[in-house]
Amino acid sequence: SPMVHCYVSQSDRGELVIGGGADTHPSYGQRGNLPTTEAVLNAVVELFPSFSRMKLMRQWGGIVDIAPDASPIISKTPVTGFYISAGWGTGGYKAIPAGGETLAHTIAHDQPHPLVEPFSLDRFAKGRLVDEGAAAGVAH
């Protein structure tokens, strides 16, 4: 939900994975912190009041890489044989299967897959940004 900045998905084992929020003091730490965890859980309970009775099994934090226009970079680079797929933000968890397939095509053919042409690394220099800031439903 963009209003409460959280998401809920169910794992193959039936467990709920709850996430969202951003540390108000960004760093490269990957441990998570209690204030962020509390904010996300409060948001989830606002959406699903019955979740207030759930037990938290574990929590973690991590780094989310986000390109300046909030769109992924899937591209060959000026360095021969060096390709990049990065900047996916939180959308990468859902979209990376297609991202992997299109990157494999780019590597195999040394040309971008037609679906990812707009997401080239040189779009920043050329001023052809792909503004996807609202695509994840949350403000990064």
Where are these regions (language model features)?
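Active-site substrate-recognition segment that forms the wall
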Residues: 1-80, 138-140
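C-terminal lid/capping helical subdomain adjacent to the catalytic/cofactor pocket in oxidative enzymes
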Residues: 78-140
